[in-house]
Each structure stands twice: as structure tokens, then as C-alpha cells.
Amino acid sequence: MSKRTGSGPTKERFVEETLVLITEQGGSQGINLRQVARRVGCHHTNAYNYFADYDELLWEATRRALLRYAEHLVVGLDDSMPQLDYFRQLVTSLASFPQDNPGLHRFLGAEPIPGGIIPDDVLDTVGRIKTWLFAAFTAVSGSRIDPAEAEDFCNITFGYIEGESIDLINGRVVLGEDIAGRMVKNSVLLFTTLTRAQPGQTYPPPPGGYPKLRLEGAASD
């Protein structure tokens, strides 16, 4: 059977229903093509009109989930924000995505790679998000630390939030504890310490504005 090209409504339904199942079941493990096809309302062999195999469907779902993640990260960011406010909003978004979307977060960052090989375009998308995060952390740091230190600051903050998030989505937290709030509070403390920000002082936004996240199909402001 030859594989069709294009992105018709049936292909879209397969991707969307895959993401719905991932959301409902807390990840992609245990989901199979027959389950997805049942949600679409067709025989599972119909999927091969659009995808070479189930792994290809999962990678298409990964692309869509990454766009949702990118869109989530830029919500509330504005060029007029002082540096600390911009940083606080950014880490709030980093911390709230796993809490709001535990299944998608596990799917994107804590599950086996489909087929063991990451497609080049997915690597490119992940690379663009990381580059933007590095640039954003450099921008909010002003000239108080150099770019290499800002990159370390980004890696430390992101790694900390990821670690807390994995505990959160795996239920390894105290019931009722505001984990996202704690992540933001600790990240802001790290920010003020590493960037040597003076208490009570407002640091204006950079003259050219903050860096923009440019991804096809995702918001950029």
C-alpha cells in the first residue's frame, strides 16, 4: 500500500487522537495503533495511508506536542517587562507546563525514543527552543554576568525545574504542596543570586527587546 502525502483531516485525526490518549493515560506507554484507530473511528490499517508505521505517527505527535510546549512558554511574555518580571513569567511557564500537561511532558521528556532515532527536524525544533532559552536567560541577566555564565544559569534552572517536574508527574510530592510555586520561588532566588541583582532595583528590558522564539506554527511573542 502506498503512503499518501499531505495533511488531510484523517491524518489530523490520527495525530490529535494520539495526543488525546497520551493526555488521558499520562504518556504514550501502553497505547497502540489499534487504540488510536478506534478513537478515530476506522480500522488501524487506515493509518498506513498516512504513516509508514506507528513510530512515524508518534513522531508526528511529538512535533505537535513540541509546538504546544513552545506556545505555552511564551504566554505572558512582553518586551516591556523589566528583567526580573520577564524571568519570573518564563520560569512560571516552564514550571506550569508539566503540572498542566503531565502526560505530554512525560511523552516529550521521559519516555523511550520511538525507533531509537530522533528525526532531524525534531532535533532542530528542540535546538531552537534551547537556543531561545539561552538567549532569554542572557537577556534577563543584563551585563551582570557573561554569556557563558548565563548559559550555565539556564542549564541549572532548567535542570532543577525538570527534576522537580518529574517528581510531580510521578506523584512523588506531598499532597497539596504548591510545587510549581516552589519552583518559581527557588528559580527567582537563584536568579537574584547568580546575576547579582540588587534588592528593590528595577532592571529595564534590553533596548532591542527580548529574543523571540521562532517556530513554524508556534507563537513568537
Question: What are the language-model segments listed below?
Answer:
Residues 1-9, 80, 198-221:
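N-terminal intrinsically disordered/low-complexity leader segments
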Residues 3-4, 64-87, 135-137:
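Amphipathic alpha-helical linker/stalk segments
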Residues 34-38, 47:
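Append "Primarily bacterial transcriptional regulators
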Residues 74-103, 147, 154-157:
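Hydrophobic alpha-helical connector segments
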Residues 99-117, 166-174:
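Amphipathic alpha-helical segments used for helix-helix packing
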Residues 146-170, 178-190, 208-210:
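Hydrophobic alpha-helical segments that form the core
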